[in-house]
C-alpha cells in the first residue's frame, strides 16, 4: 500500500518533527595515529590570534612567551585575543553590583571546600599526564607516582591527606634545585629457549633513578599533554585536547569550585546544571525577556557561535578576574586561587608522539619523535607540515612547545562562563542607557543572545554593541555562524527552543541497545535508558513498548539466549533447552538464561532479578545469587552503578542504574599481552595500590566512614582499628584468648617494622 509520507505530519506541530531530521546513525569517527599535527595547529592558531602582543622570555625555563593583554585594541571581524584588563575588571564590578554579595558568598563556600577536600579528589578523572614517566597514565596511578616522588625528595606535607597540603608540596617542589625520580625502563636480550632450542627475546623491567634539574622539572610541572578528541560528529578535521599533570590539577579544581559556586547563582549560566533543570533555568530567562518587552517592542534571539573560544581566552584575564573576585579575602586564599592562572600563563604543550614516516616501498616505517622536530631536515615533510614546523620551531623546548596565550580545551569551563555572563549582564537598560537592551544564556563557549528594541535599527545597534563589548574581553562572536530569529525559536547547547524546549528524542538513539559489559549490567542499562527517555525526552508509551521489544530481541541475539522453547539454533541453545526442561517455574528464568520477558513499560524501574525472584525455583535462586559460585569471578555487590551513555551530540553522560550482583555480573579477564611490556611495572604498582585500598575497606567496612583525619597513615589507622575490634570481640567472647594474643602480636610486629623502615 502506498502512503503519502506528508500525511504523517498533518497533525504534528512543526517542532515535534525535529526527531526526523537526525543525521547521526552509525559510529562516530575516531582518530588514529598521532595528535602532533593537531596540537601544532592549535599552538600556531593561538599565537596568530595574539600575534601583535609583546614577546618576553621566561627566566626560569627559557621559554619564549607572547602576551597580547592590554596591547592593541581588537579589530572588527578578525578573531583575536586582545583582551583589556580594565574592561574585564569593570564587567566583574557590574556583575557584582547586579548580584550583591555573590562573590563574597562563593569565596566563603570555596574556603570551606578547600579546608575539607582530600587529596584523593585527584584520583577522579581519566588519563592524566604523569610527569615522572613523561606520558599519560590513569589519574590514580599518576597521583600515586607524584606523591611517591615527593616523599622521596623530602616533601611530606601531603601525608596529612588534605589536598591543600599536597599543593603546598607542589609549590615547594618548584623551588628545589633538583628532583630525583624513578623511571621504568625495559631491557631486551636474545636468549635460547631450553625447551624449543629457538632464540627468543626476553624482556626485563628495570627501575633507575634519574635527577631532574630545576628547569626540566618546571617544564614538566607546567606541561599539558595533548591527545586527539575522539568521536566528534559533524567535523571534517580532528582537534586536540589537553590533559594536565598532577601539579596543575589541584589548583584548577579549586578555581573551578569557586567559579561553579558563582555560576549556580547566575540565572544566565547554563552550567553547572544539566538536563531538565537546565531547560527550566533557560526557559525562565526567555520568559523574562518576553514579559518585560512592551507590546510595541521587537524581540530577536541570536543562536550564537564564538570563534575559537579557548584559543582567544587568556589566563592573564582569569588572573585579573580572580584577583577582583577575592579582593577582600585572606592572603592565603587569594594565593591558592591565583596559582592556576599563573601556571597556565607559563604552560607548555607536549606535542605527543611525533610523526610516522613510511618509505615509498612501504617496507620501512619509522617514528620521528617530537623532540627531533627542532633539528630534522624539513625536506622530508610536505608543504603544509613544513610550514607548521617552521612556525613552531622558535617555541620548541625538548618536544614541548611554549604556549602562553589561550586556554586549551575544557580547562576553565566555569570561570569562562562567568566571564561570558558578565557581558550578558551589561545588557540591562541601566547600563546600555538607551532604548535597546539584551539578556541571554551562556554555557562555556555556547551562547544565546536575546535583544529587545523599539525597531530594527535598535536591534542592530544592540547586537553591534554586544559584539564589540565581547571583543574587549577576548570573546569573538562569529558573524558568519551566528543567526537571528524572532524570539521564541533558537538553539542553545543542542537544546532547541520553540515556544518551549523541544524534546529531541533522536539525539538519544545511539544510547539504545546492548552495551556489552556483561549480561546483568546490559539488561539493567537497557531498560533504564528506556525509562529515562520516557521521563525526560517525550518517549511515548507505544514507542517505549516497541523500543523495549526491540531491545529484548537485540539482547537475545547478542548473548544467544533465545527462549528455551524456541526453534532458533545457537551455540548456547542445547544448554538453555536443558535448563528450560528441568525448571519447574519457567517464568523465573532470567532472559539471559533463556527465560521469558516480564518487562513492560510499568516495571522498568525494577531489576530483573527482583522482578522474577518470587517466581524462581529454589535451587536456581541458590545458583544465581551465590558469591561462591566457582565458575564466575564477579563484581562486588553495589546497589547503584554508573554507566557511560553516548548521546549523539555533546559529552558522554553518566547514568545510574540498579545493579544486583548475580553470577551473570562477570568481569572479563585482562588481556595478558600487557604483562610483557614496559607497562608491567606500572601495572604491578596499580595492583598493589588496589590491594591496599581493598584491605583498608575491609577494616572500615562501612563506606560512610570518616576517613582518618590528622596525620595517622593508613597502616596506623588499620592497626588501631584491629586492636579495638579484637578487644571488643575478646571481651564479648567471640574470639579465644590465644587468638586475641596473636592479633596483638601481629599489630606490634607491624609497628616495629614501620619504625625500623
Curated annotation (Swiss-Prot):
GO molecular function list: nucleotide binding; RNA binding; RNA-directed RNA polymerase activity
Keyword Glycosyltransferase listed: no
Region (Disordered): 50-82
Physiological role: RNA-dependent RNA polymerase which is responsible for replication and transcription of virus RNA segments. The transcription of viral mRNAs occurs by a unique mechanism called cap-snatching. 5' methylated caps of cellular mRNAs are cleaved after 10-13 nucleotides by PA. In turn, these short capped RNAs are used as primers by PB1 for transcription of viral mRNAs. During virus replication, PB1 initiates RNA synthesis and copy vRNA into complementary RNA (cRNA) which in turn serves as a template for the production of more vRNAs.
The protein's name in its UniProt record: RNA-directed RNA polymerase catalytic subunit
Motif Nuclear localization signal location, chain numbering: 187-195, 203-216
Top-level enzyme category: transferase
Record text on subunit structure and interactions: Influenza RNA polymerase is composed of three subunits: PB1, PB2 and PA. Interacts (via N-terminus) with PA (via C-terminus). Interacts (via C-terminus) with PB2 (via N-terminus); this interaction is essential for transcription initiation.
Organism ancestry: Viruses, Riboviria, Orthornavirae, Negarnaviricota, Polyploviricotina
Amino acid at each position: 500500500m502506498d502512503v503519502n509520507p506528508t500525511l504523517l505530519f498533518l497533525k504534528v506541530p512543526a517542532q515535534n518533527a525535529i526527531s526526523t531530521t537526525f543525521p547521526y546513525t552509525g559510529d562516530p569517527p575516531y582518530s588514529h595515529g598521532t595528535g602532533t599535527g593537531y596540537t601544532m595547529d592549535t599552538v600556531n592558531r593561538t599565537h596568530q590570534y595574539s600575534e601583535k602582543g609583546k614577546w618576553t622570555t621566561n627566566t626560569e625555563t627559557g621559554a619564549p612567551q607572547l602576551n597580547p593583554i592590554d596591547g592593541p585594541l581588537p579589530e572588527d571581524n578578525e578573531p583575536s585575543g586582545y583582551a583589556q584588563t580594565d574592561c574585564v575588571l569593570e564587567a566583574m564590578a557590574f556583575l557584582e553590583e547586579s548580584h550583591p554579595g555573590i562573590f563574597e558568598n562563593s569565596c566563603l563556600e570555596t574556603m570551606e571546600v578547600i579546608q575539607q577536600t582530600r587529596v584523593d579528589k585527584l584520583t577522579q578523572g581519566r588519563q592524566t599526564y604523569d610527569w615522572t614517566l613523561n606520558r599519560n597514565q590513569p589519574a590514580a596511578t599518576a597521583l600515586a607516582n607524584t606523591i611517591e616522588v615527593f616523599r622521596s625528595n623530602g616533601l611530606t606535607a601531603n601525608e596529612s591527606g588534605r589536598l591543600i597540603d599536597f599543593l603546598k608540596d607542589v609549590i615547594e617542589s618548584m623551588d628545589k634545585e633538583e628532583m630525583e625520580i624513578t623511571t621504568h625502563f625495559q631491557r631486551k636480550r636474545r636468549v635460547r629457549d631450553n625447551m624449543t632450542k629457538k632464540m627468543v627475546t626476553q624482556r626485563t623491567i628495570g627501575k633507575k633513578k634519574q635527577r631532574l634539574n630545576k628547569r626540566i622539572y618546571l617544564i614538566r610541572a607546567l606541561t599539558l599533554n595533548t591527545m586527539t578528541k575522539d568521536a566528534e560528529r559533524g567535523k571534517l578535521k580532528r582537534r586536540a585536547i589537553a590533559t594536565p599533570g598532577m601539579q596543575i590539577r589541584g589548583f584548577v579544581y579549586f578555581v573551578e569550585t569557586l567559579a561553579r559556586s558563582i555560576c549556580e547563582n547566575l540565572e544566565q549560566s547554563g552550567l553547572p546544571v544539566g538536563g531538565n533543570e537546565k531547560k527550566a533555568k533557560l526557559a525562565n530567562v526567555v520568559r523574562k525577556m518576553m514579559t518585560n518587552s512592551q507590546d510595541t517592542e521587537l524581540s530577536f534571539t541570536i543562536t550564537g557561535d564564538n570563534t575559537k573560544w579557548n584559543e582567544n581566552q587568556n589566563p592573564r584575564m582569569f588572573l585579573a578576574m580572580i584577583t577582583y573576585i577575592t579582593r577582600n579575602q585572606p592572603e592565603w586564599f587569594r594565593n591558592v586561587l591565583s596559582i592556576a592562572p599563573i601556571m597556565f600563563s607559563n604552560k607548555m604543550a607536549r606535542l605527543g608522539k611525533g610523526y610516522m614516516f613510511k618509505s615509498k616501498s612501504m617496507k620501512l616505517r619509522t617514528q620521528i619523535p617530537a623532540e627531533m622536530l627542532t633539528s630534522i631536515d624539513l625536506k622530508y615533510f610536505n608543504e603544509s607540515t613544513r610550514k607548521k614546523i617552521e612556525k613552531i620551531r622558535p617555541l620548541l623546548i625538548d618536544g614541548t612547545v611554549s604556549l602562553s596565550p589561550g586556554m586549551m580545551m575544557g580547562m576553565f569551563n566555569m570561570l569562562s562562563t562567568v566571564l561570558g555572563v558578565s557581558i550578558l549582564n551589561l545588557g540591562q537598560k541601566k547600563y546600555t542607557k538607551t532604548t535597546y537592551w539584551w539578556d541571554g544564556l551562556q554555557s562555556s563557549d555556547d551562547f544565546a543572545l536575546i535583544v529587545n528594541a523599539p525597531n530594527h535599527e535598535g536591534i542592530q545597534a544592540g547586537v553591534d554593541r554586544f559584539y564589540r563589548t565581547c571583543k574587549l574581553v577576548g570573546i569573538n562572536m562569529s558573524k558568519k555562524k551566528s543567526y537571528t530569529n524572532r524570539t521564541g525559536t533558537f538553539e542553545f547547547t543542542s537544546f532547541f527552543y520553540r515556544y518551549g524546549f523541544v524534546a529531541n528524542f533522536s539525539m538519544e538513539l545511539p544510547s539504545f541497545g546492548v552495551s556489552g559489559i556483561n549480561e546483568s549490567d546490559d539488561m539493567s542499562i537497557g531498560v533504564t535508558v528506556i525509562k529515562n527517555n520516557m521521563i525526560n525526552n517525550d518517549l511515548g508509551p507505544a514507542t517505549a513498548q516497541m523500543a523495549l521489544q526491540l531491545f529484548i530481541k537485540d539482547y537475545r541475539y547478542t548473548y544467544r539466549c533465545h527462549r528455551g522453547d524456541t526453534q532458533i539454533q545457537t551455540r548456547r541453545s542445547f544448554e538453555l533447552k536443558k535448563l528450560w526442561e528441568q525448571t519447574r517455574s519457567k517464568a523465573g528464568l532470567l532472559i539471559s538464561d533463556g527465560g521469558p520477558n516480564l518487562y513492560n513499560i510499568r516495571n522498568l524501574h525494577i531489576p530483573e532479578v527482583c522482578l522474577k525472584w518470587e517466581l524462581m525455583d529454589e535451587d536456581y535462586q541458590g545458583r544465581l545469587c551465590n558469591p561462591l559460585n566457582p565458575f564466575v569471578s564477579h563484581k562486588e555487590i553495589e546497589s547503584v552503578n554508573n554507566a557511560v551513555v553516548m548521546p549523539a551530540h555533546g559529552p558522554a553522560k553518566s547514568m545510574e542504574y540498579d545493579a544486583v550482583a548475580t553470577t551473570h555480573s562477570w568481569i572479563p579477564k585482562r588481556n595478558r599481552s600487557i604483562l610483557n611490556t614496559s607497562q608491567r611495572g606500572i601495572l604491578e604498582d596499580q595492583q598493589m595500590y588496589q590491594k591496599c585500598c581493598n584491605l583498608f575497606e575491609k577494616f572500615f567496612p562501612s563506606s560512610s566512614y570518616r576517613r582518618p583525619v590528622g596525620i595517622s597513615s593508613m597502616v596506623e589507622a588499620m592497626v588501631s582499628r584491629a586492636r579495638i575490634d579484637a578487644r571488643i570481640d575478646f571481651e564479648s567472647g567471640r574470639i579465644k584468648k590465644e587468638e586475641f594474643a596473636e592479633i596483638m602480636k601481629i599489630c606490634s610486629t607491624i609497628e616495629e617494622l614501620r619504625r625500623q623502615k
